[in-house]
From Swiss-Prot:
InterPro entries: FliE (IPR001624). It comes from the Bacteria. Pfam families: FliE. NCBIfam families: fliE. GO terms for biological process: bacterial-type flagellum-dependent cell motility. Belongs to the FliE family. Keywords: Bacterial flagellum. One of its GO terms (cellular component) is bacterial-type flagellum basal body. Its main location: other. Transmembrane segments: none annotated. It is found in: Bacterial flagellum basal body. This is Flagellar hook-basal body complex protein FliE. One of its GO terms (molecular function) is structural molecule activity.
């Protein structure tokens, strides 16, 4: 920075550095800002008004996932019996543990739903 000038008072002399030129901002159209704001609010509205899955859909989807884990375990086990070199034992063990855990969780959910239903129907 090169000094532009000096400021002097009775005790000191100050050198004033040059200021960097501030970039000019072109004209801003209010309409372009509004369009960007509308675009943002549209995205928010879509996220907020997104249809939620019903309890039935959520439950069926979870049971489908449990079924997929069971099928994957069966396939890996069968593949291990037919061609042991093509499958890692660790993968089979992990798949079995995931399938077992998901089945236990599904059973717990079913038990809780039935208990809640029985409580509601008998609470006349």
């Amino acid at each position: 920075m090169t000094p532009v000038g000096t400021i002097t008072n009775s005790a000191n002399v100050y050198k004033v550095p040059s200021l960097r030129k501030v970039p000019e901002i072109g004209p801003v159209s209010v309409e372009s800002v509004r369009q960007r704001m509308r675009g943002n609010t549209d995205a928010v509205d879509q996220a907020v008004n997104k249809k939620a899955m019903s309890f039935e859909q959520t439950l069926l989807r979870a049971f489908d996932q449990v079924n997929q884990k069971q099928q994957k375990t069966a396939e890996l086990t069968e593949q291990m019996i037919v061609d042991p070199e093509s499958v890692d034992v660790h993968d089979v063990t992990v798949a079995m543990a995931e399938a077992s855990m998901s089945l236990k969780i599904a059973q717990t959910v079913i038990d809780k739903v039935l208990k809640s239903w029985n409580d509601v129907t008998t609470a006349r």
